Amino acid sequence: MNRRQQVKRRVGKYEVGRTIGEGTFAKVKFARNSETGEPVALKILDKEKVLKHKMAEQIRREIATMKLIKHPNVVQLYEVMASKTKIFIILEYVTGGELFDKIVNDGRMKEDEARRYFQQLIHAVDYCHSRGVYHRDLKPENLLLDSYGNLKISDFGLSALSQQVRDDGLLHTSCGTPNYVAPEVLNDRGYDGATADMWSCGVVLYVLLAGYLPFDDSNLMNLYKKISSGEFNCPPWLSLGAMKLITRILDPNPMTRVTPQEVFEDEWFKKDYKPPVFEERDDSNMDDIDAVFKDSEEHLVTEKREEQPAAINAFEIISMSRGLNLENLFDPEQEFKRETRITLRGGANEIIEKIEEAAKPLGFDVQKKNYKMRLENVKAGRKGNLNVATEIFQVAPSLHMVQVSKSKGDTLEFHKFYKKLSNSLEQVVWTNNEVKKETAK
């Protein structure tokens, strides 16, 4: 097998891999603890940007609080590190994808299933609120599923990355995706984080049960008006109890909007409700956080880049495949999440050309480097420009696996893009039948 050279990156004891998410202030990469082998998510912040926007103290405060929160439905924050130029937040790595993907793939949920996810969501939100931590940006991308199908809320407590506290002492935000955002947030006159989170939970519940958004319009001003009025229609298949609860939550007046405590007493919510039982540990060691924000030289971690050959072996292929089922790697019709894989025939350079030929007519700019490609849609969608990252791995001399992942933008747009891309590459897709023929030889 021809092995190409690839630069491997290391931060402290963590081996850093592919990018799995990207935002204005942060990039998230897959990483692995070299001492334990445990996979983690590594959120990388640029120190200069943090200081420029005067967010250091607020981020320090929220990270310190999040380190104390150990809730089964909240992505856990393990530790914080820093180099001379970057801040690294080590988070639990969640493997089940976004809750939104489940709706896209399977459609709306039955009430019992939706209720279970909503119960987990409300308990976690209320728990964090009770400790003074608010999300303020609850949306499908932040609602993940673990390998057991349990809800995990990500980015809880890291809202300082997109929120600003002004002189009036209230929170202010400029929101790029308003569908899940409370009316008072859109008005930008300041708002309470707890009631704003509650509204977002109501929109999430509606989407789980209906399969579509309660407030939607291609015209942004019309969308703002719909949200501000709080007028929406419930689909006829919803039970009366579900309709009543959604109506109480999607109250445009934050002063009369239902609270988590009132939701806990709601009859529809209480059905089959079992609050999670978990141990609240007192992890009060904040030395790593203090060191990061005091620029302590002795606690700075080193970033290393080392040249070494990258080969994808059988174990890696199996570990990348859901349910240890290799058929998913060779099936272009597979269900997928924020990232997916497709196996193609031909040489690596030939495959790069074919992906470029397929992406450009779809309106994407293409950047290439070291068998990796970055595709950016020049036309902004609902959530800004869709950015897609691809990386090519060699399985055999004329057989390559291409990993396709969303690094920025709307998940639904990514799903549509992937289907168009895989259709364009149909002639070179290595199908499941070919795998079986090869195996039978």
UniProtKB/Swiss-Prot annotation:
Q: Where does ATP bind?
A: I20, G21, E22, G23, T24, F25, A26, K27, V28, K43
Q: Name one Pfam family in it.
A: NAF
Stretch forming the signal peptide: none
Keyword Oxidoreductase recorded: no
Q: GO: which molecular function terms? A: ATP binding; protein serine kinase activity; protein serine/threonine kinase activity
Query: Region (PPI) spans which residues?
Result: 337-366
**E.C. code:** 2.7.11.1
Annotated Protein kinase domain ranges read: 14-269
Q: What class of enzyme is it?
A: transferase
A GO BP entry is: signal transduction
Q: What Gene3D superfamilies would the database entry show? A: Kinase associated domain 1, KA1, Phosphorylase Kinase, domain 1, Transferase(Phosphotransferase) domain 1
Catalytic center at which residues? D137 (proton acceptor)
- Please give the residue ranges the record annotates as the region Activation loop: 155-184
Q: What is the catalytic activity of this protein?
A: L-seryl-[protein] + ATP = O-phospho-L-seryl-[protein] + ADP + H(+); L-threonyl-[protein] + ATP = O-phospho-L-threonyl-[protein] + ADP + H(+)
Question: SMART domains under this entry?
Answer: S_TKc
Induction trigger: By stresses such as cold, drought, high salt, wounding, and abscisic acid (ABA).
- What PANTHER family does this protein's entry cite? CALCIUM/CALMODULIN-DEPENDENT PROTEIN KINASE KINASE-RELATED, CBL-INTERACTING SERINE_THREONINE-PROTEIN KINASE 3
> Which family, according to UniProt?
Belongs to the protein kinase superfamily. CAMK Ser/Thr protein kinase family. SNF1 subfamily.
Describe the subunit structure.
Interacts with CBL3 and CBL9.
Query: What is the protein named?
Result: CBL-interacting serine/threonine-protein kinase 3
Say which species the protein is native to: Arabidopsis thaliana (Mouse-ear cress)
